Amino acid sequence: MVGYDPKPDGRNNTKFQVAVAGSVSGLVTRALISPFDVIKIRFQLQHERLSRSDPSAKYHGILQASRQILQEEGPTAFWKGHVPAQILSIGYGAVQFLSFEMLTELVHRGSVYDAREFSVHFVCGGLAACMATLTVHPVDVLRTRFAAQGEPKVYNTLRHAVGTMYRSEGPQVFYKGLAPTLIAIFPYAGLQFSCYSSLKHLYKWAIPAEGKKNENLQNLLCGSGAGVISKTLTYPLDLFKKRLQVGGFEHARAAFGQVRRYKGLMDCAKQVLQKEGALGFFKGLSPSLLKAALSTGFMFFSYEFFCNVFHCMNRTASQR
């Protein structure tokens, strides 16, 4: 059970254990889904249509993009920006899950609402994600820059990237795309947590008793379903965020096709609609859905697994 559980036999994890479980969950998930993230970002930043019929398009499908990136940049390209991405995932996972557990407990103790309700999980999940985003957003900008650059590289190391970006674009560069990120992350994370809880209830109702023994599989499947639902409903805002994060980085994007500049969130949405059509809002959706299913599934699976491990350790220690 993710979130505060008022039942007497609920998990009794400490806040430190919750943070560790969230961190490890982020670390494991990031290592597994990094290739999908790189492909998704390349698709999102390509202004040309993702179609073979457009001769100027560099990428037009998941398999074609995978082969081309592999041929041009080698297998390590699928883990470009992996160091800042891991820092991002570890920090984000810790803050998000710790905040969510604390917020749901606060709601249960300080209001008439049940901490396990859909609406409570939606609001608490969204707020927890916003707190985590504010904490790690500078690292997210670095990760996007590393994943977006082709060859020759603009940034060689993390330290080089931080220094170059600070000198050429100022300190505000590390919070580029923050507004659309917060706007997108609240409903996305809120739907992740609330849909995960709802799908678990549905799973328990629909699956016979003998099929409920494997709780890990249940967590993985429900997490994957929650990831697909939440990503589909909030995807355009994620695309705007990525486009805005590479503002000022246009020289490194020239090798991938057209280059555009955006004045802000609304201007970005307007230009995408005018020049790429409504389907432009969903560029990169297919790898994103695959990534969302895997990442959200593994995120909840890993978090629940390590929380259960800590719970068993605590119970054993208390019985001595």
Curated annotation (Swiss-Prot):
The chain crosses the membrane at residues 19-39, 87-107, 122-142, 173-193, 220-240, 293-313. The keyword RNA-binding does not apply. One of its GO terms (biological process) is thiamine pyrophosphate transmembrane transport. It is a multi-pass membrane protein. Solcar repeats lie at residues 13-106, 116-202, 214-309. This is Mitochondrial thiamine pyrophosphate carrier. Its main location: mitochondrion. Mitochondrial transporter mediating uptake of thiamine diphosphate into mitochondria. It is not clear if the antiporter activity is affected by the membrane potential or by the proton electrochemical gradient. It is found in: Mitochondrion membrane. The gene is SLC25A19. Keywords: Antiport, Disease variant, Membrane, Mitochondrion, Neuropathy, Phosphoprotein, Repeat, Transmembrane, Transmembrane helix, Transport. Expressed in all tissues examined except for placenta. Highest levels in colon, kidney, lung, testis, spleen, and brain. Changing G125S: In THMD4; affects function as shown by complementation studies in yeast. It comes from Homo sapiens (Human).
